[in-house]
Amino acid sequence: MSEASGERPRVEIWTDGGCKPNPGPGGWGALLVCRGQEKELLGGDPETTNNRMELTAAAEALEALKRPCIVTLHTDSEYLRNGITRWHTGWVRRKWRNAAGDPVANMDLWQRILEAAKPHEIDWLWVKGHSGDENNERVDQLATRGREEL
């Protein structure tokens, strides 16, 4: 996923994660597309939650980028999109406590995503799951494979 030096590559990323049951065995999948090249990523965890898998997919996808990029990241997880675009600044200000004063759930993964996102310019887009978005369906299948291949 690289381009000639000088210009930041534009990368489209789709991510998904899930569990069956939730909590339980889970999987995540990601698709990275840059200049017509595609890279699929997937993995799983024997005991997790759907939210952890959604966050893991985003972290893994961003960590796979080898240089600063202009990224459009598509997710069907409102939890991921809202956390990264609306909630995290308050969490950081409150030393990783939510508005109720409790520790933020999945703090380790939120911190991992924020660190991986630093070198990039990212537009976080929400897509409705199972609504015909071909690449969203594709990463859903990757996440299922990640869970099944545990």
From Swiss-Prot:
Q: Which SUPFAM superfamilies match?
A: Ribonuclease H-like
For this entry, the protein name equals: Ribonuclease H
Record NCBIfam families: PRK00203.1
Name the EC number(s).
Answer: 3.1.26.4
User: Cofactor: bound how, per the entry note?
Assistant: Binds 1 Mg(2+) ion per subunit. May bind a second metal ion at a regulatory site, or after substrate binding.
* Record lineage: Bacteria, Pseudomonadati, Pseudomonadota, Alphaproteobacteria, Acetobacterales
Which parts of the sequence bind Mg(2+) 2?
D16, D140
Which coarse location class applies to the principal site listed for this UniProt protein? cytoplasm
Give the source species. Answer: Gluconobacter oxydans (strain 621H) (Gluconobacter suboxydans)
The signal peptide stretch is none
Q: Which UniProt keywords apply?
A: Cytoplasm, Endonuclease, Hydrolase, Magnesium, Metal-binding, Nuclease
- Positions of the RNase H type-1 domain: 7-148
- What Gene3D superfamilies would the database entry show? Ribonuclease H-like superfamily/Ribonuclease H
GO BP, one annotated term: DNA replication, removal of RNA primer
Family as reported in the entry's similarity comment: Belongs to the RNase H family.
Assembly and interaction partners: Monomer.
